[in-house]
């Protein structure tokens, strides 16, 4: 699966000169503005692709073959990892600010693609291209909230159920399974994505979750 994903990323980058006119047309149609040049936008779309595909549980069977035409490759990239994510004035900009200040954010490994990328490094991309213009280079990460939450869960035993998807990259930051906790419960949906919910968990997990919730509610 990983090889097929990376092969697609390589193929898009190798065809960058053909992809850029399609991306520019897409930008105009959606009236998007960016803080960086379009070749760099394409780089970030490709780098985000693997995270986005796993995040939403998209089957690798939907990935076009390396011999597919430019439009097929481009359409698939836009479906999974469109440039809207990196555009200015997006609806989730407040989340990006909180990520930069309190939550932290994931990075991109550019090493495998270095030969084909326009950018030299993706370090600090969140602050550079996704925050409001007036906050660029002015928001420093402060881990206090992270430590506060971690210490609260470590030192207490609140009645909490945590649900994750097995293949969701965000699950890499799941809550630790602290020893000696009676109430903390962690459920990981097999092959689940960011769409993991109580309602779509395997029946045995769903039954245990609902039984526990009803027990707590009856206390």
Label every model-predicted segment:
Residues 82-85, 144-149, 171-173:
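Short alpha-helical segments and helix-capping/turn motifs at coil-helix boundaries
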Residues 1-33, 147-155:
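The feature captures the conserved acid-bearing segment of alpha/beta-hydrolase catalytic domains
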Residues 165-167, 175-200:
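Low-complexity, glycine/alanine/valine/leucine- and proline-rich hydrophobic stretches
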Residues 91-92, 153-156, 178-181:
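Extracellular/periplasmic catalytic domains that process cell-envelope and extracellular macromolecules
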Residues 189-219:
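Catalytic active-site module of serine/aspartate enzymes centered on a nucleophile-bearing elbow/loop
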Residues 156, 162-164:
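Short beta-strand/loop motif that positions the catalytic acidic residue
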Residues 16-141:
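Alpha/beta-hydrolase fold active-site neighborhood
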Residues 110-111, 169-174:
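Conserved alpha/beta-hydrolase "acid-adjacent" motif
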């Amino acid at each position: 699966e990983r090889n097929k994903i990376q092969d697609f990323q390589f193929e898009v980058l190798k065809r960058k000169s053909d992809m850029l006119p399609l991306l520019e047309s897409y930008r105009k149609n959606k009236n998007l503005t960016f803080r960086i040049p379009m070749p760099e936008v394409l780089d970030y779309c490709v780098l985000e692709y693997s995270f986005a595909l796993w995040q939403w549980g998209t089957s690798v069977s939907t990935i076009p073959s390396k011999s597919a035409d430019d439009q097929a490759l481009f359409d698939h990239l836009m479906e999974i990892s469109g440039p809207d994510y990196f555009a200015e004035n997006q609806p989730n900009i407040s989340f990006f600010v909180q990520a930069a200040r309190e939550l932290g954010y994931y990075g991109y490994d550019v090493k495998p693609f270095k030969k084909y990328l326009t950018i030299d490094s993706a370090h600090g991309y969140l602050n550079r291209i996704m925050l409001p213009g007036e906050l660029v280079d002015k928001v420093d990460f402060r881990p206090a909230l992270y430590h506060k939450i971690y210490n609260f869960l470590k030192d207490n035993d609140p009645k909490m159920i945590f649900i994750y998807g097995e293949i969701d990259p965000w699950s890499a930051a799941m809550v630790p399974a602290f020893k000696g906790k009676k109430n903390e419960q962690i459920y990981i949906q097999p092959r689940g994505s960011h769409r993991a919910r109580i309602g779509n968990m395997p029946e045995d997990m769903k039954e245990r979750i609902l039984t526990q919730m009803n027990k707590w509610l009856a206390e």
